[in-house]
């Protein structure tokens, strides 16, 4: 499953979003965890947050549920 598919699956179900977070690589801060409720939408290239921040989808390293990794870029490489 691609990162986009996994992000959209979680968004579309809209259940328990507060249990999910996304770990991204920020060019200045390093690894940053973003709570899933902040994500407004996802397209093929970007993640759009509630404060108008736009994050390139290639910066996503992990998706976590209650702190446990459920998707990892390194584990899901093809």
Curated annotation (Swiss-Prot):
Transmembrane segments annotated in the record for this chain:
none
- InterPro entries tied to this protein: MJ1316, UPF0248
* Superkingdom of source: Archaea
- Write out the similarity annotation: Belongs to the UPF0248 family.
> What is this protein identified as?
UPF0248 protein Msed_0897
Organism field: Metallosphaera sedula (strain ATCC 51363 / DSM 5348 / JCM 9185 / NBRC 15509 / TH2)
């Amino acid at each position: 499953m691609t990162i986009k598919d996994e992000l959209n699956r979680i968004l579309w179900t809209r259940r328990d979003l507060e249990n999910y977070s996304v770990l991204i690589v920020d060019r200045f801060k390093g690894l940053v965890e973003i709570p899933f409720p902040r994500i407004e939408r996802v397209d093929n290239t970007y993640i759009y947050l509630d404060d108008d921040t736009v994050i390139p989808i290639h910066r996503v390293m992990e998706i976590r549920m209650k702190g446990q990794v459920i998707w990892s870029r390194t584990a899901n490489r093809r």
